[in-house]
Amino acid sequence: MEDETLGFFKKTSSSHARLNVPALVQVAALAIIMIRGLDVLMIFNTLGVRGIGEFIHRSVQTWSLTLVFLSSLVLVFIEIWCAFSLVKGRRWARWLYLLTQITAASYLWAASLGYGYPELFSIPGESKREIFHSLMLQKLPDMLILMLLFVPSTSRRFFQLQ
């Protein structure tokens, strides 16, 4: 059979069946997108337009702060990209999402303990234990998403078959 091109869409004949995306993977991908979108909305609501401008201005005062600020934006975009790739069954997407969570948690932990720029990204707390507890509470939704991607047999099978 010959491929037909209709504008940007390409119609191809395929003899193999496509595996349906498990509901748990769909929920995880949607949760990633919704959590990151809600994070942005909450920041805008808390700081307002003027506060966002001041935050960006403060974030780009030195090269180190600019690097941290831009890295955090890149991290958010990578997480959203992973969400879309998860639905397509890309095996690497769940591992990349795990890596982004380890990176974010490690930086938050280090910045909160004074190794980095606490005024930009840090978790307030009196002791290491209190900071760690707050960090785990903050990362709880992301840990649940990771569990949805790695623990259920349907999720594991979906990524193995793709």
Swiss-Prot record:
Listed transmembrane segments: 24-44, 67-87, 95-115
Record's bilayer topology term: Multi-pass membrane protein
GO cellular component terms listed in the entry, alphabetical order: plasma membrane
Organism: Escherichia coli (strain K12)
Localization, UniProt: Cell inner membrane
Matching InterPro entries: YbjO_DH-like (IPR019703)
Segments on the Periplasmic side according to the record's topology features: 1-23, 88-94
Chief place where the protein resides: membrane
Side Cytoplasmic, residues: 45-66, 116-162
Ribosomal protein in keyword set: no
UniProt KW keywords: Cell inner membrane, Cell membrane, Membrane, Transmembrane, Transmembrane helix
Name of this chain's protein: Inner membrane protein YbjO
